[in-house]
């Protein structure tokens, strides 16, 4: 796909005014971006415990969207300082690790090895070359410590300093004048390297990508295409895809999910971990092994389970704690994302199902139709003690609840979709009845009738709005912002190009990375 194809959206976006695209700016690394970057820079292995750093509350599911609106608190600054000093000490306190990191053995602070290392490490850490004065500043740390410590200690503190700099802790993507004058700004060659690396790999750029930026390749159509292909071909691309789905589906929340132990004795931490791992393994299989259509995530029957999760799903013949491939029965009630225990358990209460939460997910995350929050004077009486009359299903109670004019407008958008999942309990296990009562899992979506989650999934698959919404979610993750009204032509072009290329997930990744919304900005924040 030629990178130059983005010119279509340049004209469309530009027609609406020079500020049609989102503005450029700087944003903090998310905790995951920080940890993956530090691990890559210092050569840390998976056994190294991640330091405590200030977390970010997601906006529309994505932490990198929220990170663009936040500054660091005093506590956050201290946490990053402590982390940098601790991790640098861990590496430089080990002769083997520090030798592997530095790549030469400095005899003194004045040894050329010192500056060479600081230039190379600094470029990767700050994702751009250091100016001579910046190298001087950090080399000065090594020199100043020479009378009281060896050169390795000086380098340790210099590295800790580089990792505390705003140039590392923030993604500084402020752009430069666009020579075509279609947009106010284009992202620079090094900023493009940064954007590509965090989008595809969820970490700091490698030397090959920074070298491509140094030669201007990340701004040239052929060079950009080559880097996109290289990044996607790497096994490291799985990290970026995994992070997208973990945030989009909130599967990190499974680690702290609680269920009523009396009602759901199978709700163990190991089962929750298997739910999370199923999502990661299944999406990786769809994206990288099967190169499946984007919509296959809705009705896919090929999954991965261990013994604990297989038991929950009613699958036989699976033993052990490791995930293994499994095929969900064609005649069964479960398939695709909306049949996973991760979705069904997360979007439920501790003691019962929640058609409202499940329907809200479908409405907002698959159809991109935001639901307004409850009014400020909302009183939560639905789950109050004594509020559940005997002999009524949850659906019957919610239908009665929707007769309240203050509740009906929003619940009507969510509950009818969520009723499709009532054959699955709050842990995601199938149930034939609800306490002996007949379950009604029929409904309609955009005027189309369905019975159960598989028919709902089929209706969603056939709905072009769902494909557009999935692309929009990827675009938000890639760019770190909620799309502006002026970016509608960009999103339309991304969808058209990806569908023409085959409609696979990677087709959307390529189209987004090659779009005007990823490469250009409408000014500064």
Q: Which residues does each PLM region occupy?
A:
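Ser/Thr-rich, Pro/Gly/Ala-heavy low-complexity intrinsically disordered linkers and tails
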Residues: 1-21, 25
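GGW-centered surface loops in extracellular recognition modules
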Residues: 27, 34
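Axial heme c-ligation environment in periplasmic c-type cytochrome domains
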Residues: 478-483
């Amino acid at each position: 796909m030629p990178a130059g194809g983005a010119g279509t959206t340049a004209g469309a976006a530009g027609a609406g005014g020079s500020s049609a695209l989102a503005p450029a700016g700087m944003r903090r690394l998310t905790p995951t971006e920080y940890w993956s970057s530090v691990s890559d820079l210092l050569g840390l292995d998976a056994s190294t415990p991640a330091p405590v750093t200030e977390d970010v509350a997601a906006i529309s599911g994505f932490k990198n969207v929220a990170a663009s609106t936040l500054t660091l608190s005093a506590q956050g600054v201290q946490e990053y300082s402590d982390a940098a000093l601790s991790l640098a000490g861990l590496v430089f306190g080990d002769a083997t690790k520090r030798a592997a990191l530095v790549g030469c053995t400095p005899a003194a602070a004045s040894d050329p090895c010192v500056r060479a290392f600081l230039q190379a490490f600094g470029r990767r850490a700050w994702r751009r070359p250091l100016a001579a004065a910046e190298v001087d500043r950090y080399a000065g740390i090594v020199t100043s410590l020479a009378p009281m410590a060896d050169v390795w200690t000086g380098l340790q503190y210099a590295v800790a300093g580089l990792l505390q700099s705003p140039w590392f802790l923030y993604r500084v993507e402020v752009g430069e004048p666009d020579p075509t004058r279609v947009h106010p700004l284009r992202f620079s060659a090094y900023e493009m390297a940064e954007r590509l690396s965090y989008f595809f790999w969820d970490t700091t750029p490698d030397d090959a990508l920074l070298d491509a930026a140094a030669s201007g390749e990340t701004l040239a159509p052929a060079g950009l295409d080559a880097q996109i292909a290289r990044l996607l071909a790497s096994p490291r691309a799985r990290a970026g895809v995994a992070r997208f789905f973990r945030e989009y589906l909130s599967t990190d929340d499974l680690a702290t999910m609680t269920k009523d132990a009396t009602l759901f004795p199978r709700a163990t931490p190991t089962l929750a971990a298997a739910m999370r791992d199923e999502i990661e393994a299944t999406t990786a299989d769809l994206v990288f092994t099967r190169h499946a259509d984007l919509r296959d995530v809705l009705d896919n029957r090929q999954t991965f389970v261990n013994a604990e999760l297989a038991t929950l799903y009613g699958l036989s013949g699976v033993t052990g704690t490791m995930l293994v491939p499994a095929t969900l029965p064609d005649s069964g009630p479960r398939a695709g994302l909306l049949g996973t225990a991760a979705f069904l358990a997360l979007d439920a209460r501790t003691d019962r199902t929640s058609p409202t939460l499940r329907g809200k997910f479908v409405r907002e995350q698959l159809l991109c139709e935001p639901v307004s929050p409850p009014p400020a004077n909302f009183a939560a009486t639905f789950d109050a003690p004594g509020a559940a009359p005997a002999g009524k299903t949850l659906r019957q109670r919610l239908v009665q609840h929707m007769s309240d004019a203050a509740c009906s407008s929003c619940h009507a958008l969510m509950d009818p979709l969520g009723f499709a999942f009532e054959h699955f309990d709050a842990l995601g296990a199938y149930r034939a009845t609800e306490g002996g009562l007949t379950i009604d899992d029929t409904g309609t979506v955009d005027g189309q009738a369905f019975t159960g989650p598989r028919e709902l999934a089929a209706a969603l698959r056939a709905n072009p709005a769902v494909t557009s919404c999935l692309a929009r979610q990827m675009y938000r993750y890639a760019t770190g912002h909620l799309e502006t009204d002026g970016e509608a032509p960009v999103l339309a072009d991304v969808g058209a190009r990806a569908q023409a290329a085959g409609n696979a997930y990677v087709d959307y990744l390529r189209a987004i990375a090659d779009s005007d919304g990823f490469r250009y900005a409408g000014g500064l924040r």
